[in-house]
Amino acid sequence: MSVRTSSRSNKGQNKYIEYLLQEETEAPKKKRTKKKVDSAIEKNKKSDSSQEPRKDTENVRTDEVDEADEGYVRCLCGANNENYDAAEYSHGDMVQCDGCDTWQHIKCMTDGKDTIDGLMSEDSKYYCELCDPSLYAHLETSKEAEVSEDEDYHDDVYKPVNDHDDNDADVFLDEESPRKRKRSPDSAKGIHIKSKQVKKSNGSKKRNKSIDAAKSDTAENEMPTRKDFESEKEHKLRYNAEKMFSTLFSKFIVPETIEAKLYELPDGKDVISISQEFAHNLEEELYKACLNVEFGTLDKIYTEKVRSLYSNLKDKKNLELKAHVVEGKLPLNKLVNMNASELANPDLQEFKEKRDKIILENFIVEVPDKPMYVKTHKGDELIEDIAEPQEDILYSKDSIRLHNIDSIDSDKSKIEQTHAISKEPSPSTIINEESLNCAFLYPGLGLEFTGYLNYIGASQKLRRDIFKEAIGDGKLYVEGRLPTTTAAPYLKEISCSRAILVYQLFPSNDSESKTTFADVVDSLENKGRIAGIKPKTRYEKDFYIVPSKGGEIPEILKDILGSHNDERSERFSRMKSDERTLFAFVVVKQEFIH
């Protein structure tokens, strides 16, 4: 037995060296030392075969005695030759085993005592827990108590929730990796004396380890199986989920429902006990719902459901759902199977319904331009486009030709009459056949008037004539205003890629409409603004109203229609120098016209 202080600087130099040398002179001690030295010499020869045998037996024995006495560090506190440092391990003096030459802290082996008198054998020798386990029955219970105090078996997988602020945002926390924890419950058992005593890091580099210690090291250092790891992880997930639900019921659901007089505590129970009961039952039902029966494991949706239930049941606006849960009107097995939309508070559900409704209304299915064929007994037959007008079989070609000639003659006579009327001065504007009745509504200024629209033309050729359809019900509702300096360049630029329909807006003949019409023109013209109208159909991108005074035609109108539409100007009504008018510009997405 040897004793030394916990320092690497005095390794091999202790105050009992003289006593040991004196013991070696005795016969029993010589016999034991001789066996130890011989075994050390054999191991040294195997590790270094290139070293030549020494002739001086006494010198060899002297050197090996020092090395054997020095031994190696292996203590229950985890100290070993690789990590031992006197600055870190301040556990006091160390004692050396007379059986395997291992160094151990006296306090670690005696459960905090400074002496080892109780562990000495009859012949005043010290043996470690591997050489004589019967001397260390007291360590098993003490180490178990130490593990239970120092190690938190149930690490919070979801982490603690900050409940100081009821208005805080719900934070969804990720799972904590089990590798980040110090020790698992199974690994804590490895501290027991009869289990993992010799660590793997200590076993491979020791020169004087006994055969028994090597066997124990090999048998006890088996790696845990994947199944054990999964079951441990699953257990921690379930424990922390139940803990999270317990906090949810005790701090939010039960107090809020009691305060709103929607729930009363049963007789003989308090908030904590009833919350724990609810939390346990809720976790059990959630576990059953998320259990993969085929593989016997939890699905990944388990953690997502825990967070979803927690965040929605914590919501103060979800008071009705909380009351249904605690009163039992909503069974827990149905609660765990509800999706996020069903768990949301009424305001969120109403908002989602409105959003879905708008999405469905704006949903457009584009009709492909490619020809469609269908397989029949005659082969592939082309299906004509339904949107194209079909020929009326009641009319023959001759009747259609005669009908066209009559219509042409009537059109010529109408044009002559129109020119004759236009030459005559008239105080009112002429309403042609293409005029569309409309109502102008300006809520921002509180102005309303009735009038009509005359179609002027389009910047591009359209697939079909939609100038009437684009106006819809004729109600022109002003949504806002836009600076003319911004709108004019935009319309000019977009006219290259989009079709723009142009109309001229006139008021009705009644005096009230004319007065309101003049106020609208003056307001927009003086402030340099144009009015934005709510689009009437799904293929309309923008709808603008542009003012004009003094009989001038806006430059943007000339830029959009161009010189090739100069004939369209004949359809403008004659404007006096002080006359006011409005022009409507409708930007159309042709790909949505069917």
Swiss-Prot record:
* Residue ranges with Basic and acidic residues bias: 36-63, 155-164, 209-231
Ranges where the TFIIS central domain occurs: 254-365
Mainly resides where? nucleus
The cellular location(s) given in this protein's UniProt record come to: Nucleus
The record ties this protein, via SMART domains, to:
PHD, TFS2M
PROSITE patterns reported in the protein's UniProt record: TFIIS_CENTRAL (PS51321), ZF_PHD_1 (PS01359), ZF_PHD_2 (PS50016)
In-chain residues carrying the UniProt-annotated modification Phosphoserine: 177
GO MF assignments? chromatin binding; methylated histone binding; zinc ion binding
Q: Where is region (Disordered) located?
A: 23-65, 142-231
Q: Where is the composition biased (Basic residues)?
A: 191-208
Q: Which cysteines are joined by disulfide bonds?
A: none
Spell out the Pfam families in the cross-references: PHD, SPOC, TFIIS_M
GO BP annotations listed: DNA-templated transcription; negative regulation of transcription by RNA polymerase II; regulation of transcription by RNA polymerase II
Q: Does the keyword Transcription apply?
A: yes
- Please give the subunit comment from the record: Interacts with the RNA polymerase RPB1 subunit and specifically with the trimethylated H3 histone H3K4me3.
The job of this chain, per UniProt, is described as: Negative regulator of transcription elongation.
What's in the misc comment field? Answer: Present with 892 molecules/cell in log phase SD medium.
Which PANTHER family does the record associate with it?
IP08861P-RELATED (PTHR11477:SF0), TRANSCRIPTION FACTOR S-II ZINC FINGER DOMAIN-CONTAINING PROTEIN (PTHR11477)
Q: Can you tell me which family this protein belongs to?
A: Belongs to the BYE1 family.
**Domain notes for this protein:** The PHD domain is involved in the binding to H3K4me3.
Q: What is the protein's given name?
A: Transcription factor BYE1
